Amino acid sequence: MIPYLGPLDLFPPVEMAREDMGGLLAVGGDLQPDRLLDAYRRGIFPWGTVEGQPLWYSPNPRMVLFPEEFRLTRSLKKTLRSGKFEVRFDSNFRGVMANCASTPRPGQDGTWISPEMKHAYTRLHELGWAHSVETYEEGVMVGGLYGLAIGHMFYGESMFSHRTDASKVAFAHLVDYLVNNQFGMIDCQMYTDHLASLGGREIPRDAFQARLSALTASGSPRTVWSTDPLDPAR
């Protein structure tokens, strides 16, 4: 039986997540900033809804990427050095979410990024917790990603690309920023071949939870991020 959360109910222990249901832990609650931040600090994230109620997950194993293990391929390094794309941080958070929601994905019918999700994460962005990285070509946004930063932990949520390597360029700049600001881990949530190609790997949930506690200990919002002047292709 999956627990149902009322407005004041706390999350159950992550060990109660149903591995036969992809790590589903609970249903219900709300998407207010305090609940979302509490969820992420506990290693829990919302993914989709049923009858308007959020679904909360804590999968085992957990897909992560350690910034120092980011795989910068020769072709991506060439793209970065070409100067084809301009990269900005926190310049169009709403636009990134809208593109992530509307971009078709193989094997996915529709999107889990509902209007309620957009509102919730936009509010976290306004509070300084959620951030975006955008890739532009001739002034038009063609790729990007968004996620949350708590302490020295980054939680990746979604990315999109309308040009070859556009989202990878954004990700490379994100990793460079995280390395230079002593972030220890990127939560990628669930396995995909794309994330694995960038250096992501699965680790046991208990190992993820142990690292999470230390990395989120100094969890204050970082306000607006500025574009990293360093070159991730160096």
Curated annotation (Swiss-Prot):
Report which reactions are catalysed by this protein.
N-terminal L-lysyl-[protein] + L-leucyl-tRNA(Leu) = N-terminal L-leucyl-L-lysyl-[protein] + tRNA(Leu) + H(+); N-terminal L-arginyl-[protein] + L-leucyl-tRNA(Leu) = N-terminal L-leucyl-L-arginyl-[protein] + tRNA(Leu) + H(+); L-phenylalanyl-tRNA(Phe) + an N-terminal L-alpha-aminoacyl-[protein] = an N-terminal L-phenylalanyl-L-alpha-aminoacyl-[protein] + tRNA(Phe)
SUPFAM superfamilies registered for this protein in UniProt: Acyl-CoA N-acyltransferases (Nat)
Keyword Acyltransferase, does the record have it?
A: yes
What Gene Ontology biological process does one annotation of this record name?
Answer: protein catabolic process
Q: Write the record's keywords in alphabetical order, separated by commas.
A: Acyltransferase, Cytoplasm, Transferase
What are the annotated GO cellular component locations?
cytoplasm
EC id: 2.3.2.6
Against InterPro entries, the record matches this protein to: Acyl_CoA_acyltransferase (IPR016181), Leu/Phe-tRNA_Trfase (IPR004616), Leu/Phe-tRNA_Trfase_C (IPR042203), Leu/Phe-tRNA_Trfase_N (IPR042221)
- TM ranges are none
Q: Which GO terms describe its molecular function?
A: leucyl-tRNA--protein transferase activity
Q: What is its main location?
A: cytoplasm
Q: Where in or outside the cell is it found?
A: Cytoplasm
Q: Please state which protein family the record places this protein in.
A: Belongs to the L/F-transferase family.
Name the chain's protein. Answer: Leucyl/phenylalanyl-tRNA--protein transferase
